[in-house]
A protein has these predicted regions:
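Residue-level detector of anion-binding/catalytic polar loops
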Residues: 42, 62, 100, 147, ...
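N-terminal substrate-binding region of glycoside hydrolase catalytic domains
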Residues: 17, 30-47, 62-78
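Active-site-adjacent beta->alpha loops and helix N-cap segments on the catalytic face
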Residues: 49-58
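Active-site acidic/histidine proton-transfer and metal-coordination neighborhood
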Residues: 3-10, 76-182, 192, 272-274
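Histidine-acidic metal/acid-base catalytic patches
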Residues: 1-39, 98-100, 109, 135, ...
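Conserved beta-strand positions in the central sheet of alpha/beta enzyme cores
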Residues: 44-47, 64-67, 103, 149, ...
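Short, flexible active-site-adjacent loop segments at beta-strand->alpha-helix junctions, enriched
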Residues: 22, 49, 62, 67-70, ...
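Anion (oxyanion) recognition and catalysis
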Residues: 37, 57, 95, 138, ...
């Protein structure tokens, strides 16, 4: 492994991490996890069943989040049973790797993020079933001592995904209001779906388990698109948020440079007092 690019030495107000699945695509996943660890970041994963868990465990990485299921859906009884069984498997893997949070979506995602079960209209009955399913997830999480998150998505990249909007995710998580279920606030998806990012951070703040970021358009690292991440980082500090911020983005060019850009964007300069 070559020496890692130097990282920003300033104190970091957030718990920074990056998704290993999207960086250094020509390298094995355990190499990517080790690289992020060397750079002082936590490591996010997607579907754990495609990786060698022994190698990942041997890295000594701080794994921050991974998919909390491989099968299942929120909004129907059959899908809920599948989801709960799959979540149980994910919990065992998460404990083995020491993963902090297990992530859920409104339904399973297939190739290129296309929902396996698409719904143009979400009925009241589906809302009630989703809330019941998530409460059962919380019961499981409480027994096992783990935390799940529910992530918002955008309908352009994930057409027909139920409970995908930022508002839908916040409504479900806040109405359940249990510590075993938090919001995974993905600002890339919020920017496409709703915009108004700082206000959404404020609304979601009491229930945020993690904030994920990528710039838009392109889903590359901060600084490659239209989102003002420096302003968002400053606003989060002002709100008192000091929790996890994960880059779930592709590198527009060099992956080391992408990580450095992310760290810089979420390491705000200290405030200067004026006499």
């Amino acid at each position: 492994m070559t020496a890692p690019r130097s990282v920003d030495p300033r104190p970091r107000p957030f718990q920074l991490a990056a998704c290993a699945e999207m960086l250094w695509p020509d390298r094995p996943i355990e190499w990517r996890a080790a690289r992020l660890t060397e750079m002082g970041l936590g490591v996010g994963l997607w579907n754990w069943d495609s990786h060698d868990l022994d190698k990942l465990a041997g890295v000594g990485a701080r794994y921050t989040i991974m998919n909390g299921y491989l099968r299942g859906r929120l909004a129907d009884a059959e899908g809920a049973a599948m989801l709960l069984a799959s979540a149980g498997e994910a919990i065992e893997v998460g404990k083995r790797l020491g993963v902090a949070r297990l992530n859920l979506h409104g339904t399973g995602l297939g190739d290129h993020g296309i929902p396996l079960s698409r719904h143009e209209v979400v009925s009241g009955a589906m809302w009630l079933q989703a809330r019941d399913t998530l409460n059962r997830i919380c019961d499981l999480a409480e027994r096992e001592g783990v935390v799940f998150t529910l992530e918002n998505l955008n309908q352009r990249d994930h057409p027909g995904c139920p409970f995908a909007s930022t508002g839908d995710v916040l409504a479900l998580v806040s109405s359940i209001d249990r510590p075993q279920l938090r919001v995974n606030l993905d600002l890339y998806h919020t920017q496409i779906g709703e915009g108004d990012l700082i206000r959404w951070c404020e609304r979601c703040l009491p229930w945020i388990g993690e904030i994920q970021v990528a710039d838009n358009p392109g889903r590359f690292e901060p600084g490659t698109g239209e989102i003002g991440f420096a302003a968002i980082a400053t606003a989060l500090v002002r709100m008192g948020y000091d929790g996890p911020v994960g880059m779930e983005a592709f590198a527009q060019g060099d992956s080391d440079a992408a990580v450095a850009a992310f760290v810089s964007a979420f390491t705000p300069a200290p405030a200067v007092s004026v006499a």
